[in-house]
From Swiss-Prot:
Residues 201-211 have a biased composition (Polar residues). Keywords: Glycoprotein, Secreted, Selenocysteine, Signal. This is Selenoprotein Pb. GO terms for biological process: selenium compound metabolic process. The gene is sepp1b. It comes from Danio rerio (Zebrafish). Residues 188-265 are annotated as: Disordered. GO terms for molecular function: selenium binding. Glycans are attached at N28, N88, N178, N184, N207. Residues 239-265 have a biased composition (Basic and acidic residues). It comes from the Eukaryota. One of its GO terms (cellular component) is extracellular region. The lineage of its organism: Eukaryota, Metazoa, Chordata, Craniata, Vertebrata. Might be responsible for some of the extracellular antioxidant defense properties of selenium.
Amino acid sequence: MQALWPLLLSALPALLGASSLFVEKESNGSRICKPAPQWEIDGKTPMKELLGNVVVVALLKASUHFCLTQAARLGDLRDKLANGGLTNISFMVVNEQDSQSRAMYWELKRRTAQDIPVYQQSPLQNDVWEILEGDKDDFLVYDRCGYLTFHIVLPFSFLHYPYIEAAIRATYHKNMCNCSLNANFSISESSDSTKNDPAGENNQRPNSTEPVTAAHHHHHQQHEPHHHHHNPYPNSHKKSGDSDVTGKPKEPPHHSHQEHVHNHR
């Protein structure tokens, strides 16, 4: 498999760009290599705080059984990349805003590796999923400057497929959006300049506020065995309900039992 990575990395951008299933809504035009939108949860701005890192944002729904499986696999993917020498890659999960998903937040948190933050939206804030123009099981990958490199949707976002890992590796190894961290722009400056620069001439700025989008095709997929890798984070699979998020519900005295997880829409 290692010998196939260079070929897969070189082919992935063309493959994704050629398929509206992967990346874009045709009506909105291409938003790849455009700045990420600014969003916050209880005053925190995760994308701004993580400038300089490759960032992977997973939109997962706590009330969806298969989403819980996806969450459980994130730690293994992160560890696999770290074991391969890929550092400064930050993962995060944003739970859905509806009441059922908020009620099951702690189960999503429990399934996710301890040091991967799980953000819970409050019912009155602007919906982060809408800001990102994303949907359940979408993965958005941003480069070190905060530019979108991939917005991968179902069925390609299933973590037992190679597409998410390949997109992260391509973003890590290739300067796909002419990212330069030498420029000194604030989030608001980057947003204003981008709006006045539809041709993308100034896309080397590190900060951003424009949304990105994807088409969404929903399929059912059977849960597959979970493969384990050596973990450089000794406590990464010990789940904690006391960190990483704001605006979250009170932790219940007992966790709900762990279901056998299947994908559904």
